[in-house]
Design a protein with these regions (language model features):
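Conserved G1/Walker A P-loop phosphate-binding module
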Residues: 111-190, 208
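Hydrophobic core segments of alpha-helical transmembrane domains in multi-pass membrane transport
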Residues: 426-437, 499-504, 582-584, 598-612, ...
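Core alpha-helical transmembrane segments of integral membrane proteins
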Residues: 417-517
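Alpha-helical transmembrane helix bundles of large polytopic membrane transport and channel proteins
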Residues: 240, 250-402
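Juxtamembrane inter-helical linkers in multi-pass membrane proteins
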Residues: 452, 456-460, 513-541, 618-642, ...
Length: 803
C-alpha cells in the first residue's frame, strides 16, 4: 500500500484523525494524507487536485448515502466512501461564507500578435509560408474543447456537458486556412495513463508530433486546468493557450491578467469565448505563428531549487534528466517529460526508453533519496510541485469571485435533482416525461403527419406509373418494394428526432453527470460504476456511440461489462418495430406496451450484469471519481444541429442500407430459383432461405419464414424489419400482420427484437473497441439471451392461457 503523511499547510482547529467519508455537510477541512492500494487510482486522485494541504468542502452525500460530493480548487468532485475513507483530514471548520478579499486587477488590453511579453524558444528557421500545419486541440473534460473545435473548423461535433463527450479523435481543417488542420483529442485531466483517453491523447502528441498544441483552459477554473497545461508544456512543443469562458469570469466579477499570465508561463495566452465565437480569429493567428516559427514554451521547469522541500525534487528531476537524455532523444520523447514520468513510475515511458538494469536502479536510488529529503512520496511531490507553481501564478494573475452565478444556480437545482428524497422521483418524472412526449404527444403527432404525406406520395407514384403503362414487375419494385419499404421506415423519423432532442438537452444541461452520481450505488450492486449509466442511457438513442463512449471509463472491467450490457438498452432504431406491432395489436395500450419493452430490456440487463459479475467479470468494484460540471442552459444551436445530424443519418440510412435491403428482399420474394415470377411467395427464394432459420424460432411461437427473414434483415438495420414485413405482406395494416402474428406472438417477437443484436454497426463498434473475439462473444451472448428470454415469455404465456 502507498501512503503519505505530509504536514498540510494552514492547519486550523484541533481535529485530527478524521477521514473524508465522515466529514459533515457544510464543513471545511484540510487534506493531511492520501492512501490507496491502487497506485494508478491514487495518482489520479492527486492529479484531480486532492493533494495534502488542499482545503475541501463537503457538499453532499448521494441520496443512497454513497458516493459523496466535495468542492475543492473551485470545482465539484465525486468519489465513493471507500476511497474517501483513505483520505485523512485536519483543521475541520465551518465553511467561510464571507466575502473574499482579492487584490484588484485592472483591465489591460491583450497584446496583438508579436507584441506579447512572453519569451518563447524559437527555432532558427521558420516553416515556409503555406506549408501544411497540424494542430492538436487538448484540454480538460468539459472545458468547451469540442465547441472550440466546431468554431475552428465549422464542424458540428456533438457538444455535451458531461465529462468525456469526445471519445475519439476528430479531425478538421481550420476555416479560411486550408493548409492548417486540427485534431480534437479526448478530454483529459493529466498525461498520466489512468484512462484510455489519456493514453490516446498522449500517444498522439508523442507519436504524431503535431506542429503545435492548442491548449484550451476553462477560465472559471484556471487552477485545475493549468495542471494539464504544465504537463503539455513539458512536451516541449509549440503551444498556445485558449483561455475559454472569459465572458463568464467577467460577468461574475472576476478578472485575469492575461498579459502577466503568459509572461509567467512563457506561452501566448488568448482570451476567448468559444460559445460566442469571440477571440477565435486572434487565437488562430497566434496558433499559426507559433507553429510556423516553431516557438516552444519559454519555460519547462516548475520546481524551484530553493523550494519548501529544500530543492530535493528539483535535484531529482534534473539528475534523472541528465542520466536519460540520450535514451529520450533516441525514443523521440522530450527529456523533461520523460524525467517526470520516470519519477511517477510511468510504465509506458519506461519501456519506450529501453533503460538497462543499472540505469533503472540508479533512477530508483535518486527518487528514494528525494523522498527522504522531501518527507513525502514521489507522486505527492510531483503533484505538490505543480499545484504550488499554479497557486503562485493564480495568486498573481487571477481574481476569482467568491462564488459564480453558475455555481449558485447549480446548487439550488441540485437540492431537487440530487436531493436525498427527491433525486429518484425527479429522475423517474424526467424520463417518464421524455418518453411520454416522444411516444405519446409530440412524436406521435408528427408521425401521423409524416404517414399521411408518405401515403400520398406512394399513391401518386402508383397512379402515375399505371397511367404511364409501366411493366407490372417494375411497378411492383418501385411501389411495393422501394417506396413502401423505405416509406414505412421514414414515418418513424419524427419519433427518433424528438428522442434525440431530449437526450441532447439532458446531456447539454449537465443532468447526465448527476444521474451517474445518483445511480452509482445502485449500479455498484451489479458490478458497475455510476459512469456506466451514461453510456447505457445514450444506448437508448443509438448503441454505436454508446459503445464508443465506454472509452471514457477508467476500468477495463467496467468498460467490458458496459459494452456487454448496453445493447440490451432499446435503441431508437427499434422504435419503428415497436410502433408498428404495438399500434397494430395493442391499439388501446400502445404506449404501455412499448414502455414494457424498455423495462424488460433494463431488467434483462440487470440480471445479465449480476450473472456476469459473478462469473466472467468477477472482481473488486471499480472506482467512481468524476467531476460534476455546473448546470448550463442547453444551446439551441447545438441541440438543433444534433437533431438535424440524427435526422440526416436516419434519412441516409433509409436511402442506402434500407433501400438496398428492400430491393434485395423484393427480388428474393418475387422470383424462384429459376428466376421466374412466383404466384405464391412460399415458392420464392426468400421463403427457402427463411425456412432454414424458421425451425430455430418455432419454439418461440413465430416459426413463420417471413418472421425469420425479417429478423435476419434486421441485423443490417433494425428499421429493415419493418421494410421487410411491408414488402412480404404487401401492407402493414393490422389485418395483414394478423396473418402472421397473434397479439401474444407479436409481443414475443418484439421481446426477441429488443434483445438480439441491434445491428451490424454495433457489433463493428464492439470489434473496434475490444477486438474481433469479443465482438463474436457479444453477438453470441445477445442472441442466446434473446432466445432464452423470448422462450420464457412464450412458455409463461402458454401456462397463463395467453397464447
Amino acid at each position: 500500500m502507498v501512503n503519505i503523511n505530509a504536514t498540510p499547510c494552514g492547519r486550523r482547529g484541533r481535529n485530527t484523525d478524521v477521514k473524508l467519508d465522515t466529514l459533515e455537510i457544510g464543513k471545511d477541512a484540510v487534506v493531511a494524507s492520501v492512501a490507496s492500494d491502487d497506485q494508478a487510482l491514487r495518482q489520479h486522485i492527486l492529479d484531480m487536485g486532492l493533494t495534502p494541504g488542499t482545503e475541501v468542502t463537503m457538499m453532499k452525500y448521494a441520496p443512497m448515502g454513497d458516493p459523496l460530493e466535495i468542492r475543492l480548487r473551485g470545482y465539484e468532485l465525486t468519489l465513493r466512501k471507500d476511497d474517501a475513507a483513505r483520505i485523512e483530514l485536519v483543521g475541520i471548520h465551518d465553511t467561510d461564507t464571507g466575502p473574499r478579499a482579492n487584490a484588484a486587477i485592472g483591465t489591460t488590453e491583450h497584446p496583438a500578435l508579436g507584441e506579447g511579453t512572453y519569451s518563447p524558444r524559437a527555432a532558427k528557421t521558420a516553416m515556409p509560408e503555406g506549408a501544411p500545419l497540424h494542430f492538436a486541440l487538448a484540454g480538460n473534460q468539459n472545458c468547451g474543447k469540442t465547441t472550440l473545435f466546431n468554431q475552428l473548423t465549422g464542424s458540428n461535433q456533438h457538444v455535451g456537458n458531461f465529462p468525456g463527450v469526445t471519445v475519439d479523435r476528430k479531425d478538421g481543417t481550420i476555416r479560411n486556412h486550408p493548409e492548417a488542420s486540427v485534431t480534437d483529442l479526448p478530454g483529459i485531466y493529466s498525461l498520466s495513463p489512468y484512462t484510455g483517453e489519456e493514453v490516446v491523447s498522449r500517444q498522439f502528441i508523442l507519436d504524431e508530433r503535431p506542429d503545435a498544441i492548442i491548449d484550451i483552459i476553462d477560465a472559471t477554473n484556471i487552477e485545475r486546468n493549468l495542471y494539464l497545461t504544465l504537463q503539455l508544456m513539458e512536451l516541449d512543443r509549440p503551444m498556445v493557450i485558449a483561455l475559454n469562458m472569459m465572458d463568464e469570469v467577467t460577468a461574475n466579477g472576476g478578472a485575469v491578467d492575461v498579459n502577466l499570465l503568459e509572461s509567467l508561463l512563457g506561452v501566448p495566452v488568448v482570451p476567448i469565448s468559444a460559445a460566442r465565437n469571440e477571440g477565435i480569429g486572434e487565437l488562430v493567428d497566434h496558433a499559426l505563428h507559433v507553429a510556423r516559427f516553431r516557438e516552444r514554451p519559454g519555460r519547462l521547469d516548475f520546481c524551484a531549487p530553493d523550494g519548501p522541500d529544500g530543492g530535493a525534487l528539483h535535484r531529482c528531476i534534473h539528475g534523472i534528466a541528465n542520466l536519460i537524455e540520450d535514451h529520450a532523444v533516441t525514443a523521440h520523447i522530450p527529456v523533461r517529460f520523460a524525467a517526470t514520468k520516470l519519477v511517477e513510475g510511468d510504465e509506458l515511458v519506461t519501456e519506450a526508453l529501453h533503460l538497462d538494469r543499472n540505469e533503472l536502479d540508479a533512477i530508483e536510488h535518486i527518487i528514494t533519496q528525494m523522498e527522504g529529503e522531501a518527507g513525502t512520496d514521489r507522486l505527492s511531490a510531483l503533484a505538490d510541485m505543480r499545484f504550488s507553481f499554479i497557486g503562485d501564478v493564480c495568486g498573481r494573475c487571477v481574481v476569482k469571485p467568491h462564488e459564480s452565478r453558475e455555481h449558485v444556480r447549480s446548487v439550488k437545482i441540485d437540492r431537487i435533482l440530487t436531493g436525498r428524497y427527491t433525486a429518484i422521483p425527479a429522475f423517474l418524472v424526467i424520463m417518464g416525461l421524455v418518453f411520454w412526449l416522444t411516444f405519446g404527444v409530440i412524436g406521435a403527432a408528427l408521425q401521423g403527419l409524416m404517414e399521411d404525406g408518405i401515403a400520398a406520395i406512394i399513391a401518386s407514384a402508383d397512379a402515375g406509373l399505371k397511367a404511364f403503362g409501366t411493366n407490372d414487375v417494375v411497378r411492383s419494385l418501385a411501389v411495393d418494394g422501394v417506396l413502401t419499404g423505405v416509406g414505412s421506415v421514414l414515418t418513424f423519423l419524427p419519433i427518433i428526432v424528438v428522442l434525440f432532442l431530449f437526450l441532447s438537452i439532458l446531456e447539454d444541461s449537465g443532468y447526465m453527470a448527476r444521474v451517474a452520481f445518483v445511480m452509482d450505488k445502485v449500479l455498484r450492486r451489479f458490478g458497475l460504476s455510476g459512469r456506466s449509466f451514461v453510456p447505457m442511457l445514450v444506448g437508448f438513442g443509438c448503441t454505436v456511440p454508446a459503445i464508443m463512449s465506454t472509452r471514457t471509463l477508467p476500468s477495463e472491467h467496467d468498460r467490458k461489462m458496459t459494452v456487454m450490457l448496453t445493447p440490451f438498452m432499446s435503441c431508437s432504431a427499434k422504435l419503428p418495430v415497436y410502433g408498428l406491432l404495438c399500434g397494430a395489436f395493442f391499439p388501446q395500450a400502445t404506449v404501455p406496451a412499448m414502455v414494457s419493452l424498455y423495462l424488460i430490456g433494463i431488467a434483462v440487463g440487470c440480471i445479465a450484469a449480476l450473472v456476469l459479475n459473478r462469473t466472467a467479470f468477477k472482481g473488486d468494484p471499480v472506482p467512481f471519481i468524476m467531476e460534476l460540471p455546473n448546470y448550463r442552459l442547453p444551446s439551441v444551436k447545438t441541440t438543433v444541429m444534433l437533431a438535424w445530424d440524427k435526422a440526416k443519418d436516419f434519412i441516409t440510412k433509409a436511402f442506402t442500407i434500407i433501400f438496398a435491403a428492400t430491393v434485395v428482399i423484393w427480388f428474393l420474394q418475387t422470383f424462384d430459383i429459376r428466376f421466374n415470377v412466383v404466384a405464391d411467395q412460399s415458392q420464392s427464394l426468400l421463403a427457402g432461405l427463411g425456412s432454414i432459420i424458421a425451425p430455430v424460432l418455432a419454439p418461440l411461437g413465430f416459426g413463420d419464414w417471413r418472421a425469420s427473414t425479417a429478423l435476419v434483415t434486421g441485423l443490417i438495420a433494425k428499421e429493415s424489419v419493418i421494410s421487410t414485413l411491408t414488402v412480404l405482406l404487401g401492407a402493414t395494416s393490422p389485418a395483414a400482420l394478423s396473418t402472421m402474428f397473434s397479439p401474444f406472438t407479436a409481443y414475443v417477437f418484439l421481446v426477441f427484437t429488443l434483445l438480439y443484436p441491434p445491428c451490424v454497426a454495433s457489433i463493428g463498434a464492439v470489434k473496434s473497441e475490444l477486438g474481433a473475439r469479443y465482438a463474436v462473444a457479444v453477438f453470441a451472448f445477445q442472441v442466446t439471451v434473446a432466445w432464452i428470454v423470448a422462450f420464457v415469455v412464450h412458455s409463461a404465456g402458454i401456462l397463463l392461457g395467453l397464447a
